[in-house]
Amino acid sequence: DNVDGAFNALHSYWEDKCGKLQIRTPNQGMNTLINTWTLYQSEINVMVSRFASFIEVGGRTGLGYRDTAQDAMTIPHSNPGKCRERIEQLLNGLVSEGYGLHLFDPAWFEEEKKSDGFKSPTVIPVAEKDRIHGPEDACADDALWLVPAVVEYIKETGEIDFVEKAVPYADGGSATVYEHLKAILDFS
């Protein structure tokens, strides 16, 4: 009985997710790929990032900036809350000059977790600008992917005022989402 209940709950969960957007093409295989498997992969990637990948795990932990932005832009219709959470984490992982930290753990920017002693090869979670990698070590396109992710989120949710929200930078200070996006474009 518990197994049947759990199975039915799981089925209902995915029915709800997949029911938010349905694409119809003349090819049933394409329909299944787009409406089921692509959405499933996107949801799983956004929920657990790519931590499960042996390629990504190799001694590193955290969110890959580009991967996370690309994953987030695929789910605002099916999981707007998680999409916004990832976008806000990426905004926190942006340096005021406009480049993203290529790999970072969102927990670094949570006050209660700043003093856990973890030493990252990418960034040390302190507000000292000289402790964060400089633009010469930045991947120029990482943060650019956040722009369409925010656009897709706003188009889907209608939360236009999201661009006015103040969000901290990784290297200290804060600015609105709009100013973060402008910094990204100016850097690139």
PLM features per residue range, with description:
Residues 1-62, 161-178, 182-185:
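Acidic/polar, glycine-enriched structural segments that form the non-catalytic walls/loops
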